């Protein structure tokens, strides 16, 4: 249909594998990897950008949860800025090498994994970043992991289009990046079972934290609900006065409700999960 785009990779076996680089120098490696993925996202979005397919992406999560019986359930109300595009799909360590501080990608294509995992054609560029985060969780030493994750995310933002890397696009209340890390963890588990391989413990450890992440998101939404109630009350009070149910003196409640609403909304925003 005239929409095919080919990526050509320099795939020589130079430098060191990503898995080793993430152990030796995780922060510098994550900076280079984030910048590379951001550049790819920019090129991909210039060539292809489709509307948000929230239902398709969430339906796929449900299928994997049902098949894997993970005892987890997570859906995201993706922001309008989350758009489908061309992605790398399977960001595995054997596909990535680090050469003189730069990143070389090789051997990345759909193939068997695309069939087994039933991935949709157009996926958000942030899904590649989620896959990269999974690699950091797998290989990076724990004492440097948080800094490495932050560096990876910030370097991706520095190169990716602003439309898909803005604060709104990364809003943790809507799933942000975390939902794509979750998806990648399910992908890894499904491929391990399909190939009769031993499942990696880091996937189990991360999935065990899902309920904690969701609980924090629920608590934050409680503040949002309270803010909405205050804003609604600030509208209802003047209406009640117009209909004769309240006196003029009681109108002092309006600024009080408005002030409380703004304060609670700020608390809600402040409690948003870190993008990284």
Model regions and ranges:
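A detector of tandemly repeated sequence units and domain arrays
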Residues: 165-168, 173
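Alpha-helical transmembrane segments of integral membrane proteins
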Residues: 175-179, 224-228, 249-252
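Short, flexible coil/linker elements and helix-boundary hinge sites characteristic
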Residues: 25, 47-48, 144, 221, ...
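Short beta-strand micro-motifs within the conserved protein kinase catalytic domain, predominantly
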Residues: 1-2
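Generic long, charged, amphipathic alpha-helical segments
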Residues: 153-166
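Transmembrane alpha-helical hairpins and terminal membrane-anchor modules
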Residues: 229-274
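ATP-dependent phospho-/nucleotidyl transfer catalytic cores
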Residues: 6-93, 97-105, 111-127, 131, ...
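Cytosolic-side membrane-insertion boundary helix
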Residues: 208-234
